[in-house]
């Protein structure tokens, strides 16, 4: 069957998360319903990452197998029409026909995420639900210095959810940068895969550093504790965005490469 790779944007606010669930609407369910409405086919799509309720995406990547060899342009337009008619907050940004052994999850080399904090006294109006409002002045330079203590290959037990299902807490964090533009603070993270709640745990901990409550040494000590109780508060989902997924130019002809990503990418 023809396999299609799609890049997807969504507002995570109305959904219980990426993954199809019984307790409410999901992004996966919305796209699968659009495919069913368009083609009459019941499909199971796979995403590069399983975001939690309230987490947004600018560049989630999925793949789906369809019986018809659609032109990517027609498939994109048709799916977007069905999503729009259904009132979904989901948009298909790009469609590409790919080899049958491409896998949105297991073929990924790197995943990029963004966490947005608005640091100001006034509550959010336009940005409500799209960023974490912190009514204090945060020192982004201290936050960035603390973030560098987390870069590299570590046991991130401190920064994963208690119910995280990954087999190993060890991950290689390629990048964790903190920048500021006016009242907006951005935390950007890159790795092959992340643990459940890892980035939101980073954001909550780095906020403590920005407030002057923790030093970079305290953040490093929390990492070395390998204990969830040593973590700062978990930041809310509103500020988290799945930005982009990197893939090799040539996808190896194998279904399931053995990498960190074997544990998946169930972060948020």
From Swiss-Prot:
Alphabetical GO biological process terms: tRNA pseudouridine synthesis
Reaction(s) the record says it catalyses: uridine(38/39/40) in tRNA = pseudouridine(38/39/40) in tRNA
Chain segments annotated as transmembrane: none
MF GO annotations: RNA binding; tRNA pseudouridine(38-40) synthase activity
UniProt cross-references to SUPFAM superfamilies, sorted A to Z: Pseudouridine synthase (SSF55120)
EC number(s) reported in the record: 5.4.99.12
Key word tRNA processing present: yes
Keyword annotations from UniProtKB, A to Z: Isomerase, tRNA processing
Reported function: Formation of pseudouridine at positions 38, 39 and 40 in the anticodon stem and loop of transfer RNAs.
Quaternary structure and interacting proteins, as annotated: Homodimer.
Family: Belongs to the tRNA pseudouridine synthase TruA family.
Protein name: tRNA pseudouridine synthase A
Species of origin: Rhizobium leguminosarum bv. trifolii (strain WSM2304)
């Amino acid at each position: 069957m023809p396999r299609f790779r799609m890049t997807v944007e969504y507002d995570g606010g109305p959904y219980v998360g990426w993954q199809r669930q019984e307790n409410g609407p999901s992004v996966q369910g919305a796209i699968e319903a659009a495919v069913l409405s368009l083609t009459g086919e019941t499909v199971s799509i796979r995403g590069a990452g399983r975001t939690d309720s309230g987490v947004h995406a600018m560049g989630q990547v999925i793949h789906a197998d369809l019986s018809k060899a659609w032109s990517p342009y027609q498939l994109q337009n048709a799916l977007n029409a069905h999503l729009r008619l259904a009132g979904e907050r989901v948009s298909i940004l790009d469609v590409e026909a790919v080899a049958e052994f491409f896998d949105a999850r297991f073929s990924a080399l790197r995943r990029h995420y963004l966490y947005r904090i608005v640091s100001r006294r006034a509550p959010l109006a336009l940005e409500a639900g799209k960023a974490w409002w912190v009514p204090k002045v945060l020192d982004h330079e201290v936050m960035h210095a603390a973030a560098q203590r987390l870069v590299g290959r570590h046991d991130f037990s401190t920064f994963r959810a208690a119910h995280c299902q990954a087999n190993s807490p060890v991950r290689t964090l390629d990048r964790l940068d903190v920048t500021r533009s006016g009242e907006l603070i951005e935390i950007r993270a890159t790795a092959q895969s992340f643990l459940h709640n890892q980035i939101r745990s980073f954001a909550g901990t780095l906020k403590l550093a920005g407030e002057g409550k923790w030093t970079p040494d305290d953040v490093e000590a929390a990492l070395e504790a390998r204990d969830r109780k040593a973590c700062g508060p978990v930041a809310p989902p509103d500020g988290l965005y799945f930005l982009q997924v990197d893939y090799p130019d040539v996808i190896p002809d194998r279904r399931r490469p053995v990498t960190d990503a074997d544990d998946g990418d169930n972060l948020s």
